[in-house]
Amino acid sequence: MKPDSIRRYNVIGSRRISNYWWAIIIGSGGLGFLFTGLSSYLQFNLLPIIHAEKIIFFPQGLVMSFYGILGIFFSLYLGLTILFSVGEGFNEFNKELGIIRIFRWGFPGKNRRIDLSYSIDDVKAIRVELKDGINPKRTIYLCIKGQRQIPLTRVGQPLTLEEIEMQAAELAQFLQKDLLLN
């Protein structure tokens, strides 16, 4: 096997610093809201930094408790995506065997392992989608016969223009397929 006949790109998935950050911030905020709502119901402060004497339970305390519970649940959801490494995996291009393998981890259950394999002959082109603005989108797609387009880049933290151009050009050259810009 030639060392240059296989290319493998790892995908980070949900174990990004931003997800850890948001899980902690949203969880802390949710606990603060929940304790404030409960303090207004019980008519004494559960935490010394919360002063809920002037908050009446209905409707403010009830709404704060509701938002607190939602924040805690969302924080737990983010924590579970981090724990289970949802979205983590790799893209492997093997010219020797003539296959492309795309692997990702999902949530526990029957679809925990997402493992897709395609023949290199089924690939029509590599397509790059660039969209700038407040929410930039920079994605490399694998265009398969039958009008399927499979995203190859990670979600959430877009690559720089230079990185995405280099990776797409390198991949198109490696697979000897057309590179489409959109």
UniProtKB/Swiss-Prot annotation:
Q: How does it sit in the membrane?
A: Multi-pass membrane protein
What does the entry list under GO cellular component?
chloroplast thylakoid membrane; photosystem I
Sorted keywords for this record are: Chloroplast, Membrane, Photosynthesis, Plastid, Thylakoid, Transmembrane, Transmembrane helix
Compartments it resides in: Plastid, Chloroplast thylakoid membrane
- List the InterPro entries hit by this protein, alphabetically: PSI_Ycf4_assembly
The record's listing under Pfam families reads: Ycf4
Kindly list the biological process annotations in GO that this record carries: photosynthesis
> Can you name this protein?
Photosystem I assembly protein Ycf4
Source organism of the structure: Tupiella akineta (Green alga)
Gene encoding this polypeptide?
ycf4
